[in-house]
Amino acid sequence: MEDGYSLKNTVGKGEGVFATRSFEACETVIVGVIEKVLDGNYSHASQIGKNKYVLHAGLISKVNHSCDPNCGIRLNETGAHNFVAIRDISDNEEITFDYAMRNYGVDHFPKKCICGSKKCRERITGWKDLPEKRKIEYKGFVAPYLLELDTEYSSALK
């Protein structure tokens, strides 16, 4: 068991990361540590720049996607992703985040989203395909380079 979370089986998703204590909104839930630099965007890869991808150490790769997540991302001093509570999280609640919060494009999840949320988009997307309303809702809980890429790509279209 890590500090405040552990890996458990979860119905229909295999494994997931669950809180072993409660967390308050804006509290850091998981501290990110970069384990390995990757040469591309693969399943469990975290984008840390325009064409930069890494694998995080620990259980971050086991945190499941949700279209209505309870965690978001904030970069730490090493450039890794800390998972931060968007809202209060209860003890024994599954820790989730939206994969669009860390990757501009996500092309390696071809199947239908199975998050079960009332806000489900029915497919896992990257930031570039996220509805504008959702981007606004996630303000302060996404990797800043995603906003920079939005600006860069929208300027290129003009």
What is each PLM-predicted segment?
Residues 1-158:
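Conserved catalytic SET/PR domain of SAM-dependent protein methyltransferases, capturing the structural core
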